[in-house]
């Protein structure tokens, strides 16, 4: 899977590290290098298709400004549309990220139930997979917790290859 992502600052990684003790009941806890902000998935089945898709994304983002983002709360997806549940995340408030997402949805079809319109919830995943009584207790203990706040400027986006866990290319904002 490929995606356009926004980097998160060290202060967001520090929030995640502070929350880590509350995430011990989860089967999968994201490491610092895995904490990112997904802006839009990119349809491509290989690197050749990806080059074309990335050019399309860059064209759609042409003239896009740097945007502000803010994290101040922990939230959960109890039943995410794909993958295991529950998912615990830092909720990202950013009208600008929504506008960037909309630009990309104008050239790439939104993933049903996950992207486009009200379905897109910008977030930084912290952990997923917690079952049984202990899992529910872990979710209840962290859901809605106030954190930070951390505010930052997103002045670049990057193309991410999830298979290899690496950045493929970067786009500076304003684009």
Residue ranges and their predicted role:
Residues 63-102:
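Helix-adjacent hinge/juxtasegments
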Residues 72-80, 120-122, 155-166:
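Short proline/glycine- and acidic-rich turn/helix-capping motifs at secondary-structure junctions
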Residues 3, 90, 106, 159-161:
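Compositionally biased, intrinsically disordered low-complexity regions enriched in proline and serine
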Residues 144-160:
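Short, flexible loop segments at boundaries between secondary-structure elements
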Residues 1-68, 96-148, 166-175:
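Basic, often amphipathic N-terminal segments
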Residues 33, 84-86, 120, 153:
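Exposed loop/turn and edge beta-strand positions of beta-sandwich/beta-sheet ligand-binding modules
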């Amino acid at each position: 899977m490929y995606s356009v992502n926004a980097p998160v600052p060290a202060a967001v990684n520090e929030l995640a590290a502070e929350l880590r003790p509350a995430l011990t009941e989860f089967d999968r806890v994201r490491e610092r290098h895995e904490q990112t902000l997904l802006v839009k998935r990119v349809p491509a089945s290989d690197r050749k298709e990806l080059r074309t898709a990335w050019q399309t994304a860059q064209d759609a983002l042409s003239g896009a400004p740097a945007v502000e983002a803010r994290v101040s709360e922990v939230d959960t997806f109890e039943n995410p549309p794909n993958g295991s549940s529950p998912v615990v995340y830092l909720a990202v408030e950013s009208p600008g990220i929504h506008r960037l997402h909309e630009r990309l949805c104008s050239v790439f079809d939104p993933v049903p139930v996950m992207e486009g319109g009200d379905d897109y919830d910008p977030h930084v995943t912290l952990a997923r997979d917690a079952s049984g009584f202990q899992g529910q207790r872990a979710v209840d203990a962290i859901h809605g917790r106030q954190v930070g706040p951390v505010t930052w400027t997103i002045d670049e986006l990057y193309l991410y290859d999830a298979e290899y866990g690496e950045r493929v290319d970067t786009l500076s904002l304003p684009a």
